[in-house]
UniProtKB/Swiss-Prot annotation:
Reversible hydration of carbon dioxide. It is found in: Membrane; Cell membrane. It comes from Mus musculus (Mouse). GO terms for biological process: carbon dioxide transport; regulation of pH. The keyword Cell membrane applies. Keywords: Cell membrane, Disulfide bond, Glycoprotein, Lyase, Membrane, Metal-binding, Signal, Transmembrane, Transmembrane helix, Zinc. The lineage of its organism: Eukaryota, Metazoa, Chordata, Craniata, Vertebrata. It is an enzyme of class 4 (lyase). This is Carbonic anhydrase 12. Its cofactor is Zn(2+). Zn(2+) binds at H120, H122, H146.
């Protein structure tokens, strides 16, 4: 297709596909929210698994971490989606969701292949931008991206796999405030078209792998659950060790663009704080693909650690330079005094016996 024709088609498709409300209920058709009578504290009344075992998210801290040398880097197949393939972006009433191509999958979760289903985000609000679901040593990040996959070797589709053993695998990306991220703008730039629940738009494909952090071979791995109802404990979690950065402006756009409610709802509710609280993690281990160190123990970002290290090296260099200068100066003064010979005054014998 010629570029001009493709551009025109994309522009046309960027118009909202559905202005009218549509249902975005979870798997079993019931409604739930993050606060209020149908909020997180009451999820287990309608969704028993939410009060059961292996719940997510969790806090990733040193006491529960164990290095596993067998954890290999994941391979991302089909993640580079052609711009000519259009992806459906939807406000599902709980988050902004991007439905993914069926030819996207991950290898490395032996012995099965997991096919991509969708990705979505969790975030806080403009006054408290700490909306990640997983935490590291008690630290919340600004937001969190989840890329959801199902076991395509064992099950025909996501719905069938969702409550089954080894059914799901989710990649979690922790997001912090920093430099602007053009890859995330490929989603954020379309948020105005999915402002209200049920609205959706087609957007051009892009390389989904660009949403992942540097060094994706470093990650936490544990068995947990969906973080939203029905909270099925069927998820193999991979939480990447290193966060990605988005700008303050990008985060603010995410925090202020969307609503939980339909366009015609008389009491609209901003889509904020759509994250579940950290769950108990009794008698489980989190396996890690990297040797435990400063980044894990403190939850500091790689950028902060490098900055501190650089400042330390610079400080040591200055101290050494000053010490060398003082030493040379002292040595120079000693050299200047070498040519001066002091002799005591000795009287002549004649003068002594006069």
């Amino acid at each position: 297709m010629p570029h001009r024709s493709l551009r025109a088609t994309v522009v046309l498709l960027l118009v909202i596909l559905k202005k009218q409300p549509s249902s975005s209920a979870p798997l079993n058709g019931s409604k739930w929210t993050y606060v209020g009578p149908a909020g997180e504290k009451n999820w287990s009344k309608k969704y028993p698994s939410c009060g059961g075992l292996l719940q997510s998210p969790i806090d990733l801290h040193s006491d529960i971490l164990q290095y596993d040398a067998s954890l290999a880097p994941l391979q991302f197949q089909g993640y580079n989606v052609s711009v000519e393939k259009l992806l459906n972006l939807t406000n599902d009433g709980h988050s902004v969701r991007l439905n993914l191509n069926s030819d996207m999958y991950i290898q490395g979760l032996q012995p099965h292949h997991y096919r991509a289903e969708q990705l979505h985000l969790h975030w806080g609000n403009r006054n408290d931008p700490h909306g990640s679901e997983h935490t590291v040593s008690g630290k919340h990040f600004a937001a969190e991206l989840h890329i959801v996959h199902y076991n395509s070797d064992l099950y025909p589709d996501f719905s069938t796999a969702s409550d089954k053993s080894e059914g799901l695998a989710v990649l979690a990306v922790l997001i912090e405030i920093g430099s602007a991220n053009p890859s995330y703008d490929k989603i954020f730039s379309h948020l105005q078209h999915v402002k209200y629940k049920g609205q959706q738009v087609l957007i051009p494909g892009f390389n989904i792998e660009e949403l992942l952090p540097e060094s994706p071979g470093e990650y936490y791995r544990y068995e947990g659950s969906l973080t939203t109802p029905p909270c099925y404990p069927t998820v193999l979690w991979t939480v990447f060790r290193n966060p990605v950065q988005i700008s303050q402006e990008q985060l603010l756009a995410l925090e202020t663009a969307l609503y939980f409610t339909h366009m015609d709802d008389p009491t609209p509710r901003e889509m904020i704080n759509n994250f579940r609280q950290v769950q108990k993690f009794d008698e489980r281990l989190v396996y890690i693909s990297f040797r435990q160190g400063l980044l894990t123990d403190t939850g500091l970002s790689l950028g902060i650690i490098l900055s501190v290290a650089l400042a330390g090296v610079l400080g040591i260099s200055i101290v050494l330079a000053v010490s060398i200068w003082l030493f040379k100066r002292k040595k120079s003064k000693k050299g200047d005094n070498k040519g001066v010979i002091y002799k005591p005054a000795i009287k002549k014998e004649a003068e002594v016996h006069a």
